[in-house]
Amino acid sequence: MSHEAEEDLLEYSDNEQEVQVDNKATEVNAEGNGESQAKDSDKKGSYVGIHSTGFKDFLLKPELSRAIIDCGFEHPSEVQQHTIPQSIHGTDVLCQAKSGLGKTAVFVLSTLQQLDPVQGEVSVVVLCNARELAYQIRNEYLRFSKYMPDVKTAVFYGGTEYKNDIDLLSKKETVPHIIVATPGRLKALVRDKHIDLSHVKNFVIDECDKVLEELDMRRDVQDIFRATPRDKQVMMFSATLSQEIRPICRRFLQNPLEIFVDDEAKLTLHGLQQYYIKLNEKEKNRKLAQLLDDLEFNQVIIFVKSTVRANELTKLLNASNFPAITVHGHMKQEERIARYKAFKEFEKRICVSTDVFGRGIDIERINLAINYDMPNEADQYLHRVGRAGRFGTKGLAISMISSEDDEQVLAKIQERFDVKITEFPEEGVDPSTYLNT
């Protein structure tokens, strides 16, 4: 990192409590003596092993408990089990957990639990790197606050009419209590004094590594951060959190609880079958059609490396009687959201996308991810294939390898995540290995 970048960081305390959550760590903490646990429980960022049997053990507001039941959730995931008991009490959090384990629900439930809505005051700010992700997070807030009619939530991101945001924020009765936004748009609203963040109590960054690794976006975040009170809860979440980015995250945190679910080398998803297919570039279309014909799937997402390839492949699929839609960063925002919504609502089973859908997007029916083009780096592979097999369910990921560069990326993926990705068998794979019964 450059010296200039280091100087641009906020100077906050680096004092933190780190928790490595795996089976062994959980057992050790759960068996600690009562005296030490009682002592630690008063310390912000401390950790006591908790084995909750259900969401009811978190003693959430009745309105939240009803919404959770409506969603069909009974038992918290590992990351929820270890994080929610402290996050609902205002502890700062730095959390890394693999894709699909319910990180979003951690901060949505925690902030709603703490929220005491006051008309005209913004209490919660959630930042993320992608517009579709912001839209999705807003919908999660709507889902879990369905029995909290006084709570108002809004989403702000670039590519939409700035005046509409200003109009919403100009009237006390329409000012949202919860804001989900991309940094650029919210920075503009803060800069132009259209929004007052002086009452913010919870500040969340989802996909924090992606948000903070780019210097321009980090500076936007810092400007927004400075507009909020110093005394607030800060929570950060991501599926990948490199050793290099962690100190940058900690600059925003005060004595945080750090949760790392599983060793970083084991971040690939349980229940996700992963294969590769070696072939020439010109063979990809024929092989893709064969896979779509032969495999059983609910919905599939196909990743390509460019907007042009996304558009061309979608045309080809539709012409070949495979109804598909495409989503990429070069289309108008309204169109992107409309297509995302159509895919999520199962209007189409096939989506061709660039990496704009490679992070955080949660569509429950996706159980097949295909890398038509390989990503450039190992971490992006994890985020891509994590679209299948969400929340511990089964799924299938297939990567097409057509160059030496692809082979090098595949080798890095296997080394980085300590996983063996095998060649796709000629006879195919048993659907029971990747379909939930």
UniProtKB/Swiss-Prot annotation:
Chain ranges of the Helicase ATP-binding domain: 84-259
Residues covered by region (Disordered): 1-45
Feature: compositional bias, Acidic residues: 1-19
Reaction(s) the record says it catalyses: ATP + H2O = ADP + phosphate + H(+)
GO biological process: mRNA processing; mRNA transport; RNA splicing
Residues bound to ATP: 97-104
Organism superkingdom: Eukaryota
Record domain Helicase C-terminal: where: 287-432
The protein's enzyme class: hydrolase
Sequence motif DECD box, location on chain: 206-209
Motif Q motif, residue range(s) on this chain: 53-81
PROSITE patterns according to UniProt: HELICASE_ATP_BIND_1 (PS51192), HELICASE_CTER (PS51194), Q_MOTIF (PS51195)
Residue stretches in coiled coil: none
SUPFAM superfamilies linked to this entry: P-loop containing nucleoside triphosphate hydrolases (SSF52540)
Gene Ontology molecular functions: ATP binding; ATP hydrolysis activity; RNA binding; RNA helicase activity
Keywords: ATP-binding, Helicase, Hydrolase, mRNA processing, mRNA splicing, mRNA transport, Nucleotide-binding, Nucleus, RNA-binding, Spliceosome, Transport
EC number: 3.6.4.13
Compartments where found: Nucleus
GO cellular component: spliceosomal complex
Pfam families assigned: DEAD, Helicase_C
CDD domains cross-referenced by the UniProt entry: DEADc_DDX39, SF2_C_DEAD
Protein role: ATP-binding RNA helicase involved in transcription elongation and required for the export of mRNA out of the nucleus. SUB2 also plays a role in pre-mRNA splicing and spliceosome assembly. May be involved in rDNA and telomeric silencing, and maintenance of genome integrity.
Similarity annotation: Belongs to the DEAD box helicase family. DECD subfamily.
Entry's free-text remark on domains: The Q motif is unique to and characteristic of the DEAD box family of RNA helicases and controls ATP binding and hydrolysis.
Designated name of the protein: ATP-dependent RNA helicase SUB2
